[in-house]
Regions:
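Conserved nucleotide-cofactor-binding alpha/beta core module
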Residues: 150-153
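Extreme N-terminal basic, low-complexity initiation segments
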Residues: 2-8
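Active-site pocket-lining/capping segments in soluble small-molecule metabolic enzymes
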Residues: 20-148, 166-170, 174-325, 332-407, ...
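As written
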Residues: 161-162
């Protein structure tokens, strides 16, 4: 998506800008699952992106970055004054250790701005190669997969030669601040948006157990988000195992859960959960008859579907703490997701640095994206139900729906590459680096000028009336009943 305004070019030139002397502007780091998504991230305000080879970057599927795309990405990033980090955070078995150096050597020669790594053995191998002069001296960033949760671990990795630590998602704001105080000269990176894994920073075995697809090899099947039925159980007096019991037809599980939560809240959340000693059996929809014992205590349920992380309201605090980079998860997400999250977090960072109050409309903009419900995760300590989505394992559509890309505009008519259906009378939103604009769609034409009542979806191309200044924008349909300003 090309940048057409002097405003965005001006801000691009001011790297590490800071209008408030007390706050340094943190880097905004976006995911790139393809070159188009990388370009959109930069256009909408990202300072850097991360991407990696499918074999080594925990994204074996839906990942377009082969060696040729990585080379193009690094070159384009540097031409724009941006950064490109190569994700190489696999926890490899022996067969991949043998091939790793062979495959990473040409990537290092391209001089990315950093290698995101998790495995100590691979880090040692790369550092030894750099120390011997075999490779260019590329900074190493420690992946969130390494589960760094305290300042002594940060100091250890600093001695090893790591330049940046991507802190574990399980840390609170106060814990992050303590690490910054104890490690003032180490770069710190924090996730602020995206999917949350129910395991400790992604170290999960559910997918491997159910499907023999190892999440730590980049093939997670998201078993935590499947549909599970709950059945009461009793203890077998002979074996001690949990066995299913006939559920009372008058038993209301939702009511029992609500009563348990009320009881827990009444004791201040510090006592033992009333349901802690009860064992239930879970039955996954695709595995009838395979019953798994499950317990819930004050920390939650250990097979569950987490809400998505959204920490845009904490950007100012993170900037004041001195976090160097704010990171968005989502290499498999859409170009629309990349553009909207980059735009929202860019505004939040710029407002914080300029001393402006947080704009709550940014939360509304992010709620327009498909999501599983939002939580601030462990940044703030909240009851367990605030972290979890008990009702559905898929993302809800949000209040705006990505429907197309503006390819060109001529004589007041925009050519749209249609992605999803929209029709005359819909409220539309144009998403552009210079600002967004809402309007009611009055006409749709074919490329030949024939009138249409709707654009059926991909792979259609249609024309709609639109101002010239929105060339290269994205187009969304605003769902009924959603308000908001016409421009932002």
């Amino acid at each position: 998506v090309p940048i057409t305004t002097a405003k965005r070019i001006f801000w691009d030139l001011l790297d590490n800008r800071s209008m408030n002397p007390l706050i340094k502007s943190p880097e905004l780091l976006l995911p790139a699952g393809s070159l188009d998504k990388m370009r959109a991230a930069y256009d909408f305000g990202a300072d850097a992106v991360y991407a990696g080879q499918p074999r080594y970057s925990l994204r074996a599927r839906n990942n377009e970055f082969k060696i040729e795309q990585i080379e193009i990405g690094i070159r384009e990033a540097h031409e724009r004054g941006k950064k490109f980090f190569v994700t190489s955070n696999l926890l490899p078995h022996n067969d991949k250790v043998r091939t790793y150096l062979r495959d990473i050597e040409p990537v290092i020669a391209m001089k990315p701005d950093g290698l995101i790594m998790a495995d100590p053995g691979l880090i040692m191998m790369v550092r030894e190669g750099m120390d011997k002069g075999n490779y260019a001296d590329v900074p190493i960033h420690l992946s969130v997969q390494a589960n760094t949760v305290n300042y002594m671990a940060v100091k250890f990795w600093q001695k090893v030669g790591v330049k940046r630590i991507i802190l574990s998602r399980e840390l609170s704001l106060d814990e992050i601040e303590k690490i910054r105080q104890e490690c003032p000269d180490m770069e710190l990176e924090v996730f602020v948006h995206g999917a949350l894994c129910i395991a400790y920073s992604g170290r999960c075995l559910l997918s491997g157990y159910f499907n023999r697809r190892d999440p730590n090899q980049g093939t997670c099947t998201n078993a935590c988000r499947w549909n599970y039925a709950t059945q009461p159980s009793a203890e077998n007096p002979n074996t001690g195992e949990a066995i299913p019991v006939a559920m009372d037809k008058n038993f209301n599980f939702n009511q029992a859960q609500e009563e348990a939560e009320q009881s827990f809240a009444a004791c201040g959340g510090s006592a033992r959960h009333p349901e802690a000693d009860k064992v239930y059996l879970l039955e996954e929809a695709g595995r009838p008859g395979q019953l798994m014992p499950i317990m819930e205590d004050e920390h939650g349920t250990y097979i569950m579907n987490s809400k998505d992380l959204r920490a845009i309201e904490h950007v100012e605090r993170l900037a004041k703490i001195g976090v160097d980079s704010l990171k968005v998860e989502g290499r498999t997400k859409s170009l629309y997701y990349v553009a909207r999250t980059a735009q929202a977090y860019r505004r939040a960072i710029d407002d914080a640095v300029a001393g402006r109050a947080f704009n709550p409309n940014l939360i509304t903009e992010l709620e327009g994206l498909a999501n599983r419900g939002f939580t601030s995760g462990f940044l703030e300590r909240r009851p367990s139900q605030d972290y979890q989505n008990y009702e559905t394992g898929h993302s809800d559509i949000g209040h705006s729906h990505f429907v197309g890309e503006i390819r060109s505009i001529e004589n007041g008519w925009a050519e749209v590459e249609v992605k999803n259906k929209f029709e005359v009378g819909d409220t539309m939103e144009v998403i552009h680096p210079s600002g967004n604009h809402r309007f009611k769609l009055e006409k749709i034409h074919t490329l030949q000028g024939e009138e249409l009542t709707n654009a059926p979806g991909s792979p259609w191309q249609v024309r709609i009336p639109l101002e010239e200044r929105f060339k290269g924008a994205l187009l969304a349909r605003v769902m009924a009943g959603v308000g908001g300003a016409a421009t932002a």
